[in-house]
């Protein structure tokens, strides 16, 4: 059978289709199947590049819309702890609440966000960006490379904060007094 037969049997499919054929007469049928593109053989490299660019744009728009919807939901959110951060890794987009984050660590111009359930996300934002965003929600800078969710701290032990998940994070000498005040108050 043809590609059209296969698509007809599937009914719906979770992927995009680019038809490549030597026959112009199938173009209308390809349009009916909502093909991303219809390329005549021999396929020209620039035509294939354009089709792939169109695919990327279409999927970036979906991600962008999802992120924009979450942004608008955050603006209307009265409970700051219910606000969600949008984190994109590869082709997946995650939405996590600040309460889920145990701590953030700096890695050059990237930040690793660690969650209570053991997940780890790498973000292209700096730790300073996250500090600005999360400090009003109870996050505390304990070291130049570490930001901690105060609600996750169980105790201080020999220059370290210990979290509910047993993680031990160093507190810099410069930050010790500030950390003690923040935890006491």
Model-inferred region functions:
Residues 8, 32, 131, 180-181:
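A cross-family signal for key residues in well-ordered alpha-helices
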Residues 12-13, 136, 185:
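Short, well-ordered coil loops that connect the C-terminus of an alpha-helix to the N-terminus
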Residues 53-170:
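Conserved binding/recognition cores within well-folded domains
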Residues 172-185:
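Short, basic/aromatic-enriched C-terminal tail that caps enzymatic domains
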Residues 1-71:
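CheY-like receiver
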């Amino acid at each position: 059978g043809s590609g059209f037969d296969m698509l007809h049997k599937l009914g719906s499919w979770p992927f995009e289709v680019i038809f490549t054929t030597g026959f112009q007469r199938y173009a209308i049928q390809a349009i009916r199947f909502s093909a991303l593109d219809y390329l005549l053989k021999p396929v020209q490299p620039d035509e294939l590049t354009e089709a792939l660019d169109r695919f990327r744009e279409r999927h970036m728009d979906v991600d962008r819309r999802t992120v924009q919807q979450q942004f608008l939901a955050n603006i209307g959110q009265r409970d700051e702890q219910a606000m969600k951060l949008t984190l994109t890794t590869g082709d997946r987009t995650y939405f996590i609440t600040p309460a889920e984050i145990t701590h953030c660590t700096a890695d050059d111009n990237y930040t690793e966000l660690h969650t209570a359930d053991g997940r780890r996300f790498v973000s292209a934002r700096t730790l300073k960006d996250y500090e600005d965003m999360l400090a009003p929600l109870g996050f505390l800078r304990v070291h130049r490379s570490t930001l901690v969710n105060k609600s996750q701290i169980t105790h201080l032990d020999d220059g370290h904060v210990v979290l509910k998940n047993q993680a031990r994070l160093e507190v810099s000498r410069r930050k010790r007094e500030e950390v003690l005040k923040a935890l006491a108050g």
